[in-house]
Structure formats: C-alpha cells, structure tokens
A protein has these predicted regions:
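S-adenosyl-L-methionine
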Residues: 1-94, 99-148, 192, ...
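Glycine-rich phosphate-binding loop signature in dinucleotide/nucleotide-binding domains
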Residues: 71, 143-151, 175
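Conserved S-adenosyl-L-methionine
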Residues: 81, 155-159
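A short acidic, amphipathic alpha-helical/loop segment
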Residues: 90, 94, 113-114, 165-172, ...
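Residues at the starts of beta-strands that form the adenosine-phosphate
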Residues: 96-97, 121, 179
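Conserved beta-strand signature within the Rossmann-like core of class I S-adenosyl-L-methionine
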Residues: 154, 176-185
Length: 235
C-alpha cells in the first residue's frame, strides 16, 4: 500500500498471548480472541495481525467495506478464503450464520478455537472453493444446494482463484439480494473482467479507494503496475 494510512499501525503495539488450554497464539481483536496457527512465533503473529489491521483501514484499497457497503444484522456470510477469519469475527454478533471455507489444516484448528463461542452459527468447510467438485474442491452452487440458509454476503479473497469461484456460483449469482466483496488485484486483468461480469449479472458496483502494487506477482507484472484492490457489488 502506498498511502499515509499505513502509519497509523505499528506491529510493536500488538500484545500476543498463548492460550494454555490449546497452546495456540492469539490477540484480542475488538474484545474477542483471534487465534493464529501454532507454527507462528510471536513476531510473525504481530506482523500478520498488523497487516490485517492495515488492510481493513477505511482508506485501504483492500478494505472490504465502506460507509454504503456494510454487513447488516442477520446477514448470512460466505467467507471464501477465510484464513484466520478476522472479517467474520469482526461481525460475528450481527451475522445469522457464517460459512468459513479453509483448506489448510493449521488454519482450521485456529478457526475452531476463534469461533468456539459461536459454534452454533458457524460452519467450517475444509475445501477449496472452485469451479469443480471433488475431494479437495467444492463450488458455491453445489455447497448451497441442500442448505437451509441463503447467503446475503459473499467475501471472495482466494489468492488469484477468484475467477474459478465465480464460475462455480452461476446459480448463486442470480440471488436477488446479494452483496459481494471481491478481490481484484491478484491477476492483472481481474478488475476489468470482474467489473464487466458483475455488471452483466445485474450488479451495481464500486471500487475500493486507491490502488495496490502486488509484489507477489512481480515476475509477470505489466503496465499498469498499480491495480485496483477490490470491487464491492450489490443488487
């Protein structure tokens, strides 16, 4: 991120604790325990949590929400690419139900600890979300086929596999009341392609503030070097 808002966050201010009952490191996030994987040391947790705080600053290109695009009371959230689950945890009191998709076993352990107080309304799916269904992958459409709830908010942040996720939710995308927070910086053409796709699907959308330089894609980086971070879409 190339903006002054970064200066408001310092990893040295973060206090990392260890839960004696399970050995997992955690930080207090808005009065709730946010657990991290047990392979993270103290400094790694601090760096990670500081990055998460910075990402969700209102001026950040990576911020999922805005003043006009929010999580509402009794929303049903599909958190696609949940990792540590900070987005769901931030809004857990409002949410009617949340589905966390996370394949990594270490992160699943951390998620189970984080959401233990709300386990009656949290479902953890240990698969990648994609455009096919097999032992390791699942599509949004097939997952929802036999579920009693209907999603009202879908957050998609999956390290470049966003297009596959969209391809696997052709039925879900037609829901009349749906909000989507969709990352667009992982691949060079994502913003242009996804904004067009969502427009064709009947969504109104806005881009997040500013731009990002995605350092993980330096080998294939082409002009324009700076990318829009996120699309917020709703019907």
């Amino acid at each position: 991120f190339c903006a002054p808002f970064r200066e408001a966050y310092n990893w040295k201010d973060i206090n990392v604790l260890i839960d004696a009952s399970n050995g997992l490191p955690y930080v207090m996030h808005q009065g709730k325990k946010l657990y991290f994987v047990r392979s993270f040391n103290d400094r790694t947790v601090k760096y990670s949590y500081n990055g998460l705080r910075t990402e969700q600053d209102p001026d950040s290109p990576h911020c999922y929400l805005s003043d006009n695009f929010t999580v509402q009371q009794d929303d049903v959230l599909l958190d696609v690419g949940s990792a540590e689950g900070i987005f769901a945890l931030t809004h857990i009191e409002k949410l009617k139900h949340v589905v966390l998709f996370e394949r990594n076993a270490e992160w699943v352990e951390a998620l189970e600890a984080t959401f233990a107080p709300w386990k009656e309304k949290v479902t953890i799916i240990r698969k990648y979300v994609s455009d096919c269904d097999d032992t390791e992958n699942i599509t949004i459409d097939s997952f929802l086929a036999d579920k009693p709830y209907v999603p009202t908010f879908i957050k998609i942040d999956v390290e470049g596999a966003e297009k596959r996720v969209l391809n696997g939710m052709q039925k879900t995308i037609q829901l009349p009341e749906l909000k989507i927070a969709l990352c667009t910086y992982h691949q060079q053409k994502d913003f242009v392609e996804f904004s067009h796709y969502l427009t064709e699907a009947g969504f109104k959308w806005n881009a997040s503030k500013g731009v990002m330089l995605f350092l993980n894609d330096m080998e294939s980086l082409q002009t324009p070097f700076f990318r829009k971070g996120l699309i917020r879409a709703n019907k």
